[in-house]
């Protein structure tokens, strides 16, 4: 009897309370970066029935209308009706942003290496905090992501498309998905075992109508037929009713969906959230760099699965550690891959910012449906432009 292994990941829609908060934080970040690319931003958002609180620390020369940014973001998501208990024009907006701590700023603005005489421009910026970050890639999907999180993202994105186009007129913005994939003894995905979808809806929509529409127009439109069989289980709005949703149903906070943002639990996570943070915060920029490295390693054929860990000390430019784990799938020793990575990628914060062009207002688009593995938008850390350099670097190390 072959061994049956299951793995589950989830995603949430742009209308989920925590994702509303993430999108508002990143919309504020983008608005500031559009005027001041050198800004330091840490913007947190809390949403609940009828209210939005924005708080955190910034250092910038920009002036932005936070009230307008918040309302426009909420409207774009789809909260435009008073009956939702949270609507763009009636919500109360309460900003409370203060200047970044001078103690932190002195280590970011001039790294330890620079203070000790290193004149390299890329050694000037220190990491905005200590911490560890992970990046991951696997050859399960064309975008080199784990299949469970890839399908979960596609399901909630499909729900949003059907809602915004009006094809399913009773849908409301809040939704969640969860996909359980069965793997064979070689860790290859063979079928989808279970799909869970909970979607907010107008009160007149019936459970039978929702179930039929979601299975036919969402699940079967997203999941390849080869992965579905008579034993695949569908749980559609299993509570029986989901009219009250969004911030009226649950409060939301920036940074509470870090597993949804990354690899669906398939890879380790350092614990730092992304949204609302400029690229001097290595929680964000180094996580993107680690994904960039892992994806190019797998695309280069140097491994079929790769997890990259980076770690930093606050106010220090160089990472304190770089680790590559290929789970026994690499074509060369992992120490060789680590040496090649250090040759090809400048992993100082300023090096990452330059390499990935991270001073641009590109972040709001990442705040829903995942920061990694996106095929619908052009993100620099998803590009496969380091494959040849890695292959050549491996040869020089060997």
Swiss-Prot record:
Reaction(s) catalysed (UniProt annotation): L-methionine + ATP + H2O = S-adenosyl-L-methionine + phosphate + diphosphate
Cofactor binding annotation: Binds 2 divalent ions per subunit. Binds 1 potassium ion per subunit.
Source organism per UniProt: Streptococcus pyogenes serotype M6 (strain ATCC BAA-946 / MGAS10394)
Protein residues bound to ATP: 16, 174-176, 241-242, 250, 256-257, 273, 277
Residues that bind K(+): 44
Top-level taxon: Bacteria
GO BP: one-carbon metabolic process; S-adenosylmethionine biosynthetic process
Residues annotated for Mg(2+) binding in this entry: 18
This protein's name: S-adenosylmethionine synthase
Keyword Transferase: yes
GO function terms (MF aspect): ATP binding; magnesium ion binding; methionine adenosyltransferase activity
Family, similarity comment: Belongs to the AdoMet synthase family.
Keyword Membrane: no
Catalytic class of the enzyme: transferase
Cofactor: Mg(2+); K(+)
Entry function: Catalyzes the formation of S-adenosylmethionine (AdoMet) from methionine and ATP. The overall synthetic reaction is composed of two sequential steps, AdoMet formation and the subsequent tripolyphosphate hydrolysis which occurs prior to release of AdoMet from the enzyme.
Localization annotation: Cytoplasm
EC code(s) of this entry: 2.5.1.6
Keywords assigned: ATP-binding, Cytoplasm, Magnesium, Metal-binding, Nucleotide-binding, One-carbon metabolism, Potassium, Transferase
GO terms under cellular component: cytoplasm
CDD domains the UniProt entry points to: S-AdoMet_synt
Residues the record lists as binding L-methionine: 57, 100, 250, 281
Assembly and binders: Homotetramer; dimer of dimers.
UniProt gene name: metK
Pathway the protein acts in: Amino-acid biosynthesis; S-adenosyl-L-methionine biosynthesis; S-adenosyl-L-methionine from L-methionine: step 1/1
Pfam families per the UniProt record, alphabetical: S-AdoMet_synt_C, S-AdoMet_synt_M, S-AdoMet_synt_N
Flexible loop: annotated span: 100-110
């Amino acid at each position: 009897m072959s061994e049956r292994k299951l793995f589950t990941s989830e995603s949430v829609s742009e209308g989920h309370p925590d994702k509303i908060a993430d999108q508002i934080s990143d919309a504020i970040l983008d608005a500031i970066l559009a005027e001041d690319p050198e800004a330091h931003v840490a913007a947190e958002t809390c949403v609940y029935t009828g209210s939005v609180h924005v708080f955190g620390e910034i250092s910038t020369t920009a002036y932005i209308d936070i009230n307008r940014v918040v309302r426009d973001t909420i409207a774009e998501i789809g909260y435009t009706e008073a009956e939702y208990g949270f609507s763009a024009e009636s919500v109360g907006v309460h900003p409370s942003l203060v200047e970044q701590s001078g103690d932190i700023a002195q280590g970011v603005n001039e790294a330890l290496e620079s203070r000790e005489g290193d004149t390299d421009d890329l050694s000037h910026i220190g990491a905005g905090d200590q911490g560890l970050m992970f990046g991951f890639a696997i050859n399960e999907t064309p975008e080199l992501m784990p299949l469970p999180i890839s399908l979960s993202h596609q399901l909630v994105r499909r729900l949003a498309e059907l809602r915004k186009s009006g094809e399913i007129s009773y849908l409301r913005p809040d939704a969640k998905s969860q996909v359980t994939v069965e793997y064979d003894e070689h860790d290859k995905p063979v079928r989808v075992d279970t799909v869970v979808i909970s979607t907010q809806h107008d009160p007149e929509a019936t459970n039978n109508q929702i179930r039929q529409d979601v299975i036919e127009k969402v699940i079967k439109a997203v999941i390849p037929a080869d992965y579905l069989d008579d034993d695949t289980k569908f749980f559609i709005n299993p509570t029986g009713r989901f009219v009250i949703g969004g911030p009226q149903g649950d409060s939301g906070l920036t940074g509470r969906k870090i597993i949804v943002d990354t690899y669906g639990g398939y890879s380790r996570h350092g614990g730092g959230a992304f949204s609302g943070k400029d690229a001097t915060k290595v929680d964000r920029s180094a996580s993107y760099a680690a994904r960039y490295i892992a994806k190019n390693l797998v695309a280069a054929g140097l491994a079929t699965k790769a997890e990259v860990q980076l770690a930093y000390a606050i106010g220090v430019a160089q990472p304190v550690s770089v680790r590559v784990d290929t789970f026994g799938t690499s074509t060369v020793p992992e120490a060789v891959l680590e040496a090649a990575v250090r040759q090809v990628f400048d992993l100082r914060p300023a090096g990452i910012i330059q390499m990935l062009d991270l001073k641009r207002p590109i972040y709001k688009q990442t705040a829903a449906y995942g920061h990694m593995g996106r095929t619908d938008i052009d993100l620099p850390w998803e590009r496969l432009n380091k494959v040849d350099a890695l292959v050549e670097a491996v040869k020089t190390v060997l």
